[in-house]
Amino acid sequence: MGRCEFYHPFTPYRIQLELMQQIYGLLESGKKMGIFESPTGTGKTLSLICSTFTWLREHKAGYLQGSTGAQDSEEDSEDEPAWVKENYEQSVLADVTASMRAYEQRLAAVDTDLLVKGAAKRQRVEVAVERPDDGAEFLPDAYHSDVEERPSHAGGRGQLRKQLDADIKRLLRKLDEPDAADKSRLAANPLKVYFASRTHTQLGQFAAQLRLPQFPPSLAGLEQERVKFLPLGSRKQLCIHKKVSKVKSDGINEACMDAVSKSECSFFSAAREPDIIRQFQDQAFSTIQDIEDLVGIGNTLHACPYYSSRELIEGAEVITLPYQHLLLENARKTMGIDLRDSIIVIDEAHNLIDTINSIHSASISLTELRQCKLALQAYLAKFKTRLNSGNRVNLLKLIKMVDVLSQFIETQYKNGKRINDPNDIFMGTSMDVVNIHKLEKYMKTSKVAYKIDKYIQATTSNDLQDRGSRDIKQPILFKVASFLKTLANPSEEGQFFFENGHVLKYMLLEPSEVLKSIVTEAKCVILAGGTMEPVNDFFTQLVPYLAPTDVTTYSCGHVIPDDNLNAFIVSENFEFTFANREDIALIERLFHFIYQLASRVPFGMVVFFSSYKYIDFVVKTWTDRGLLSRLDAIKRIYHETSDGADVLKGYSETIQSEKKGAILLAVVGGRLSEGINFENELARAVVLVGLPFPNMFSGEMIVKQQHIKEKVIRNGGTQEDVNKAVREFYENICMKAVNQSVGRAIRHASDFANVYLIDKRYSGPRIQQKLSDWVRKRIQSASNIPKILSDTEAFFSGKGL
């Protein structure tokens, strides 16, 4: 019998208790990683919070004691008798307890409304400086060759002196407040839980869930210890500067740095003040605050929430952050994130491999390069006489680089073709990788991408329209800058290649190296998700360097009763392979099954197809033969389209207002299969048509397949091993998508639905083994269509429908 007390705010279900025991046991074991599958609707987030934070609070005292006494050398302690050491440790613990108690009392005295009430009196007014409309705001700072700062330049000296004056003033203020450092240290926490997820909404939901449990203090002498929670966000989420906050996400970082460097942001200046930071910290830690709350505190204190929150990292116990803040090493360094001895929880981890590959990849199309050249030429024509020589020379070099890339794509393009040496791009030109490094540094230092895109967005010049650049107002310069950065610093684990549509792309092929530094630093990394099967991808692609004994894997069941879900494999005369999926007889058989099913399933049915193109083909085939109207008479038909039109609203309203219900035709991997919950009447049936294998002829898949082949051969494998590895790769991508789509149906403990997998290949043991466990164990024995339809009728009849 494992541990039973995790301070869960409700009486946990058995599977929730088992999940918490597994996670707590992982942290106790000292293993480096755990992979946990907990279906949506099973209270996964609360289970993660309660298990990890219970462990943290129970072990925090030892870490506090160790870190406080770390200044004493081991040699001194070896000469001391045991009773001296014990008395010293008790003394240290008493000091820590007193400090923490004092800090909790300070937080208890924080009036969260007080600052708001007095804000009007204290708030400094940020005066917008009126400037003549001469285009000066679009000009980059003077740039001198490849040197970022020139001490001999008068302007540079002035800027440097201004920065030094500000730093000196800040240091003097700290000297005038000898207790400031001590007060900060009161809130320092040596143990942390970092919780990363994909979207702002998911992180906000975590904050809401964190408010529910009540945890005991970490030290016996404390009456209360608040959860010190900090949500880290992007500038886009946290900026309160009137002008900068309106900049599009691509340019907001450079817009912020531009305002800071020119001392045009009083919010940033305030965020460097020790007293303001102390107030911000007390407000943030006095209760559980989400991103929007931090923005409110920043507005009240007239201090930048983005920079202020970074000062609070040391004092936090629980930190939420977007994937990028965790997975990009430069982002961690910039934010001051130290992962040593921390517990890292990565939620929605079924996306982790794709996310790592995506954020470390870059691409540029021939069309985008042409748009970029138009923008650069228009900018130079407007400001040529006002740019210093350093800017002019580098902008001309940038145009030359764009020409080189364009010419390379035009002459060398072939879908899936690999570029093994980036220097091949510059063959026969005057450019090389050294030039790329210099240009990448220039764009970063001068912030010229932000300046040019700002100008292009602001201008209404007819000249731009005449030159055929209707889409020139898109922030193309940032995409070019990102690609140049990748071109200058490609990883050995990546590959340049051509993708369909005259696109030059760089893709990371080995995500394990990105995660390795995180796994090495952290105490433990927990990967959690609703649909983690097939899990062997995580071992082969993410942590091949970890022994299986260092990884705990656990898949918990669903909270629903066994009879709330049936899974049927509809194999009779159905096989949607690439070769025959457009067979008209097959499409007609599909219609007849869906038609019969629709008359037996109440309310909503969601039918998933492999692609938008295939939905269009099926709908057209049914329409041409007069079949769609027959189906529409039973249930209203809606289908997801590639243009992003919102069909969910109409689908939902029809189910609520019309007794017959509706059918939604959706795409596996599309927006409706990933981000939408089809609970209750929205999906009493989920249907999967075929197996959604990726397009093996796309440039990306061609390159990945070749990489797998070379990797297997390099490790001594045979051609048979290659074939097996490639097949496994494609099947895993397919079945992750299937599991994600099926998981849309059951969203809470009393929900119920049926799942229909239409393809005889689902009958194979290898494919079934890759289904989520809670679906696999509910596969029914019925295989012929009449029996499946009969069982369907009985299922819903038993539910009173």
Swiss-Prot record:
- Where found in the cell? Nucleus
Q: Where does ATP bind?
A: S38, P39, T40, G41, T42, G43, K44, T45
Which is a Gene Ontology cellular component entry for this protein? nucleus
Q: Where is the Helicase ATP-binding domain?
A: 2-412
Reading the lineage from the top rank, the first entry is Eukaryota
Which top EC class is named for this enzyme in its record? Answer: isomerase
Q: Which GO terms describe its biological process?
A: establishment of sister chromatid cohesion; interstrand cross-link repair; mitotic G1 DNA damage checkpoint signaling; mitotic sister chromatid cohesion
Enumerate the cofactors the protein uses.
Answer: [4Fe-4S] cluster
Spell out the family assignment given in the record's similarity comment. Answer: Belongs to the DEAD box helicase family. DEAH subfamily. DDX11/CHL1 sub-subfamily.
What name has this protein been given in UniProt?
ATP-dependent DNA helicase CHL1
